[in-house]
């Protein structure tokens, strides 16, 4: 075995041992139906910081319900200087750092919070690592790319790839996230009912509804869906130190519409501990919706219960540098299998003698929708 192969073998063994050291514990969901989950990054994306979420995941009859916790006192602690900065609680749930907060590359940071019942928690310290830039982004249209959410058919998708150059002579760990934006035509769906502009809801009941189980209503103006990726995508440079990483698969964007769509890719350098946690999470939850959903065994990260050390907390608080790139996916000239963004074939309320119907509905700004054209839209 050559020295190069020996080093590679040793590094692989180190990674395997590191992942296997991540603590997991079985949850009897029939007995314990509520789990404290913490997730989020402190990043150098100061214009669009990560929301740090502290919430309960409740499991009932196989379903998952996420419950934000109000009146939590949360802060970021600089472990070297001891400086503590309070996080700002959001109305929609979660916490953000103050607008003037900046990461010091020489510091390490911990998340500290107290629940309303007085229990105190603190994460192990994390530091920022420099992230190399994204060099190229490109895509391929694949006719039968992925299974539909219900697992009943294959759907077409644009598979998005990127290239970047790994930093040489150091151990690096990467995590990728993406958000994609789709233009949508319909803003409301009413089941066995019609939309009422007076109540802004599906309040006109149709007891003899014998067409389809629903009506879809067009948006009154432009509207864009915001679709965040929920799949974990991590990598170690153990066998590619200093090399150009070409063709890393980042996303499979379903063929929702004949028009193009916009994808924002985030490339992050993360700590070895964060990599081990997310790699373990990747292995356990790729068939589910993410950390808040039910894993085979809950994954304990770096959050410690100071009040009751025996109590386990699921999740991880990390610190990361982000490199971003927005990429336009052009669907011109492709013909594939539609995956309707509504989850069903659109069916609009038919015209009637009442010329005020069917009404159009508003595009209400939220975490999953915006009436404002995203930057980079073509």
Locate predicted features.
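Bacterial N-terminal signal peptides that target proteins for export
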Residues: 2-10
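C-terminal motif of bacterial Sec signal peptides marking the signal peptidase cleavage site
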Residues: 17-20
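A sequence/structural signal for flexible, mid-protein segments enriched
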Residues: 22-73, 77-378
């Amino acid at each position: 075995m050559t020295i190069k192969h020996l080093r590679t073998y040793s590094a692989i063994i180190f990674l395997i041992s590191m992942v296997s050291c991540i603590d997991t514990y079985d949850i009897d969901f029939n007995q314990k139906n509520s789990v404290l989950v913490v997730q989020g990054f402190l990043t150098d994306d100061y214009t669009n910081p990560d929301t740090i979420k502290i919430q309960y995941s409740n499991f009932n009859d196989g379903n998952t319900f996420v419950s934000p916790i109000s009146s939590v006192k949360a802060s970021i602690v600089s472990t070297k200087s001891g400086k503590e900065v309070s996080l700002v609680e959001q109305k929609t749930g979660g916490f953000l750092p103050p607008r003037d907060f900046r990461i010091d590359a020489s510091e390490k940071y911990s998340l500290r919070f107290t629940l309303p019942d007085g229990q105190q928690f603190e994460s192990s310290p994390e530091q920022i690592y420099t992230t190399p830039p994204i060099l190229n982004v490109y895509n391929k249209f694949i006719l039968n790319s992925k299974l539909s959410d219900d697992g009943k058919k294959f759907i077409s998708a644009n598979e998005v790839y990127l290239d970047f150059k790994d930093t040489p002579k150091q151990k690096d760990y990467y995590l990728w996230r993406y958000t994609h934006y789709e233009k949508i035509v319909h803003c409301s769906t009413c089941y066995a009912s019609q939309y009422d502009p007076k109540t802004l809801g599906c309040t006109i009941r149709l007891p003899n509804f014998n067409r389809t189980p629903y009506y879809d209503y067009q948006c009154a103006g432009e509207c864009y869906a915001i679709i965040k990726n929920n799949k974990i995508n991590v990598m170690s440079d153990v066998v590619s130190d200093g090399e150009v990483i070409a063709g890393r698969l980042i996303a499979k964007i379903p063929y929702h519409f004949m028009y193009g769509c916009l994808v924002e890719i985030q490339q992050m350098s993360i700590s070895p501990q964060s990599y081990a946690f997310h790699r373990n999470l990747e292995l356990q939850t790729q068939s589910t919706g993410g950390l808040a959903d039910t894993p085979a065994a809950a994954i304990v990260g770096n959050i410690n219960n100071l009040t009751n050390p025996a109590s386990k907390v699921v999740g991880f608080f990390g610190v990361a540098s982000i490199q971003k790139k927005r990429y336009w996916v052009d669907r011109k000239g492709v013909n594939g299998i539609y995956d309707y963004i509504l989850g069903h074939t659109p069916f609009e309320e038919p015209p009637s003698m009442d010329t005020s119907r069917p009404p159009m509905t508003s595009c209400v700004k939220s975490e999953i929708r915006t009436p404002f054209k995203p930057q980079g839209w073509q």
